[in-house]
Amino acid sequence: MVNFTVDQIRAIMDKKANIRNMSVIAHVDHGKSTLTDSLVCKAGIIASARAGETRFTDTRKDEQERCITIKSTAISLFYELSENDLNFIKQSKDGSGFLINLIDSPGHVDFSSEVTAALRVTDGALVVVDCVSGVCVQTETVLRQAIAERIKPVLMMNKMDRALLELQLEPEELYQTFQRIVENVNVIISTYGEGESGPMGNIMIDPVLGTVGFGSGLHGWAFTLKQFAEMYVAKFAAKGEGQLGAAERAKKVEDMMKKLWGDRYFDPANGKFSKSANSPDGKKLPRTFCQLILDPIFKVFDAIMNFRKEETAKLIEKLDIKLDSEDKDKEGKPLLKAVMRRWLPAGDALLQMITIHLPSPVTAQKYRCELLYEGPPDDEAAMGIKSCDPKGPLMMYISKMVPTSDKGRFYAFGRVFSGVVSTGLKVRIMGPNYTPGKKEDLYLKPIQRTILMMGRYVEPIEDVPCGNIVGLVGVDQFLVKTGTITTFEHAHNMRVMKFSVSPVVRVAVEAKNPADLPKLVEGLKRLAKSDPMVQCIIEESGEHIIAGAGELHLEICLKDLEEDHACIPIKKSDPVVSYRETVSEESNVLCLSKSPNKHNRLYMKARPFPDGLAEDIDKGEVSARQELKARARYLAEKYEWDVAEARKIWCFGPDGTGPNILTDITKGVQYLNEIKDSVVAGFQWATKEGALCEENMRGVRFDVHDVTLHADAIHRGGGQIIPTARRCLYASVLTAQPRLMEPIYLVEIQCPEQVVGGIYGVLNRKRGHVFEESQVAGTPMFVVKAYLPVNESFGFTADLRSNTGGQAFPQCVFDHWQILPGDPFDNSSRPSQVVAETRKRKGLKEGIPALDNFLDKL
């Protein structure tokens, strides 16, 4: 299938049971893009000779130069299963041709927002793990996200060539390595998954079922137990039995797969399988996986890499491998590649695993609907999503914007969950802040064109039915990053994506030539569109701030801004870190503030959260949308709150969802409800810009103790109450031992044993501390996990490499907020320097404002 016409693809799109939407996820440099190549070349978009070198999905120039994937790209593949293989599919199917929409996502932590966007539009994930270094921190983060989105994983052990050629492992050691990785992945799945009783059933991976692949993306070969089981079934069948029917054959292969993994042993003397490790006459038996699967592979490697021509020729003949004439003259590694590629082609093994084990939209949307759709579970839109119904109302989620070749326009990239999207269709474009029945963030516009994404190319297409991934033209002006597109009037939004990282590093940018300012502003708008994570902020002082997840992320954003979006030379400041303000004990006095007209008084106190509550709010375990009683019960049980107080939470802040709480513990106050909105507004304002240096507050609980109000409504309007509430909140913070919190990275460093000492040295200089150190079993590598303040992380990588001779590779993920030790009022302390710097940068008055500005006397 080299030449694909759009009409052919369009025909398959209607067979929604035969669509697979999947993403490839993994730790950085475990070989996702390389593997994706062998899939793409099998489905015929790259000429097969170049696979493994092209990295088709790395479409950007900087991706090809840095050899990392930065943005997630989508490609449609087509694969036909043979009659025999169709019997392995346990869900509904429709013909033998399958359309696979594949999204290759980046593995670098700084880009994990890209991964989140990719996960939202897919139903299954191919998790790639390097079998030498095992399951790493990013694999875990991404897999956890996938399971939270109810996405079914299958596993691929990549880089087997390294295990055989570099580490020279014995078959039994290699089996143990695989076994350990499978266990690690299953531990993650069972920790974050919903168990067998959940809506998805059992999603644990198991080589016996064929949900684990083994192979090498670089050399272009791979297999699951199914491939070998088929060879042996055919071999045993040839000895005596005649032809089997397809269904019986599938049954036999499944039985055979059960014997090829785990504690099953093979007795070569009589060709029997046994469950004990010793044969009747006391000999030690080889494990079946080693004897029947690894042994032939080892033999091929051994014969070819030691240049034994006759043995090689015999093996090639025995395995029935047909080489091209040009391959016959090769020797060493090139010949090894050619032989393995012919014998166990990676494309086939992986595409079979994907089509057989990953769910179709029909299967997946049944259990994903409740996570995807915010509205009631029984309205038209929800029913359409659940049944993946092309006749239902159009429901489509845009997960990100993809820049087009002409500067400044974007394709909206997303997935149709119900209905059909077509060129010229008039739709409702709903941004993330849309609420049903209101007009904000809602546009009624026609779609100009629908297009298919093909890696580096796009193809126009008339219409696309549900279950497919598509690009839209002409929607980009109405959405910033994500949104919902629908034709159903009462539709609610599709749920917003939760990112596992937060933008904590910021730089200020300005144009080198002041006349270019309008271009810079325009460029920042485009940048905010093109990256799901980045935040572009204009400070009151007129500074333009870009906030990103880490150093690398920001570097790439700035490069994009300079070259693609604004196209002007740019000056940037040194990166600075966002802080949070908090309190460390309860206010020592009951704070009183009077309104400007002296007729209203508010009394409040502040106190810190119990440990863990702020994190629960971030995760969404406790939120403003929850049912009141359930939330009160949760707070009472887990954090020992008073139930009566827990029920009287007025709001969360900043932005209505942040990790600060305003509770009302007043007794019988007149007119209280009339000023509730004003106090809440003051609270949102105060928590967004704290008292110390106008950073967000975090982990503070404010209690309204008492309120005395003027009887006349006109004297207690918003203009009187809002600033008073804010002053009172500031006073209660300043009397409660305020502190600063700084963001902390979790750093995972892989390195050989001899340089571990160097790592400790670097971390100690940077205020970091190691909390776990372990050896990767079966390899000389150590994994060191440490906490490192984000503030100290600039240039950390370079420092580490120079101190360890380039042998240590760090991965940083934002992990938590931690209180900066020291009192911000003490001039010699670290926090007071930070406060002073931040205030200076923001153009505020020097020094923390005095308490008298906020606290009034009776």
Curated annotation (Swiss-Prot):
Binding positions for GTP per the UniProt entry: 26-33, 158-161, 216-218
Residues with the N6,N6,N6-trimethyllysine modification: K525
Residue list for modification Phosphotyrosine: Y265, Y373
PROSITE patterns given in the database record: G_TR_1 (PS00301), G_TR_2 (PS51722)
GO biological process entries: cellular response to brain-derived neurotrophic factor stimulus; glial cell proliferation; hematopoietic progenitor cell differentiation; positive regulation of cytoplasmic translation; positive regulation of translation; response to endoplasmic reticulum stress; response to estradiol; response to ethanol
Cross-link (Glycyl lysine isopeptide (Lys-Gly) (interchain with G-Cter in SUMO1)): K239
Keyword Magnesium tagged: no
Source organism, top-level taxon: Eukaryota
Record-listed Phosphoserine modification sites: S325, S502, S595
Residues modified to Phosphothreonine: T54, T57, T59, T435
Residue ranges occupied by any tr-type G domain in the UniProt entry: 17-362
Family: Belongs to the TRAFAC class translation factor GTPase superfamily. Classic translation factor GTPase family. EF-G/EF-2 subfamily.
Protein name: Elongation factor 2
Lineage of producing organism: Eukaryota, Metazoa, Chordata, Craniata, Vertebrata
